[in-house]
Amino acid sequence: MYNPFDEAYHGLCEEILEIGNRRDDRTHTGTISKFGHQLRFDLTKGFPLLTTKKVSFKLVATELLWFIKGDTNIQYLLKYNNNIWNEWAFENYVQSDDYHGPDMTDFGHRSQQDPEFNEQYKEEMKKFKERILNDDAFAKKYGNLGNVYGKQWRDWEDKNGNHYDQLKSVIQQIKTNPNSRRHIVSAWNPTEIDSMALPPCHTMFQFYVQEGKLNCQLYQRSADIFLGVPFNIASYALLTHLVAKECGLEVGEFIHTFGDAHIYSNHMDAIHTQLSRDSYLPPQLKINTDKSIFDINYEDLELINYESHPAIKAPIAV
């Protein structure tokens, strides 16, 4: 079946595999990479959740709502069984003086290569998650990821200590001055990079109103094509829907612009498996509430007619 969203994503994967540069990287995993690429998704044609592997809409939506709420603590995510950010918080904990368990140095690589260590790692992670959920003081200290996306979107702080809600301001601008070229939200705050568990990969987005439709363009400096990008596509498509509804507009395009678009060397088999699959028709999104974007919960969102191939597991590079 024809699915323009799968087709665009598959095309990017194939191009990276064909012409990409082999590079070392921060995680020492190794990548094949292309610098500079753009995908365009017409959101009137459906919701761009890939169908050639199962992508969890719940994980996409709860992470985005976490950003929108300005939250930076994984406790909110874990309440929805969303484990996307666990490794970065866990890393901070096991490097602290409060951790007294087995040595977790380089747990990302060791858990993939040593089955015995992997069992220890899973047990320590399980205990960590339980403490985050059940011990608010512990969660406050070790569940916080620093000044990551939610903080920058909702509470940007300048050098004078003034605070600025970028997302709320942009929504107000769209309502009052839709033709402005300043509908921009940035997560890249150079003065706070060192205080973030992970510097923002999706760094800046801009809205553009045209004929009653809201378009959104994202610039992503670093893009994990197999694990991250399917989530990023769906996340910013959902953001476009939510902001459009808030502003009384229809959705238009989501434009995804990449800097370093890369496939990790240990994702090659997974990518080839996905590329061998045929697509299903794209699903539809329904927002079952008139709440403000800042009050919406996951339960207010509904994904209709999502049919996909099974998920494909691959290791995360920390």
Swiss-Prot record:
The active site is at C201 (nucleophile). It catalyses: dUMP + (6R)-5,10-methylene-5,6,7,8-tetrahydrofolate = 7,8-dihydrofolate + dTMP. Signal peptide: none annotated. (6R)-5,10-methylene-5,6,7,8-tetrahydrofolate binds at D224, A317. Pathway: Pyrimidine metabolism; dTTP biosynthesis. DUMP binds at R26, R181, R182, R221, S222, A223, D224, N232, H262, I263, Y264. It comes from the Bacteria. Belongs to the thymidylate synthase family. Bacterial-type ThyA subfamily. Homodimer. Catalyzes the reductive methylation of 2'-deoxyuridine-5'-monophosphate (dUMP) to 2'-deoxythymidine-5'-monophosphate (dTMP) while utilizing 5,10-methylenetetrahydrofolate (mTHF) as the methyl donor and reductant in the reaction, yielding dihydrofolate (DHF) as a by-product. This enzymatic reaction provides an intracellular de novo source of dTMP, an essential precursor for DNA biosynthesis. This is Thymidylate synthase. It comes from Staphylococcus aureus.
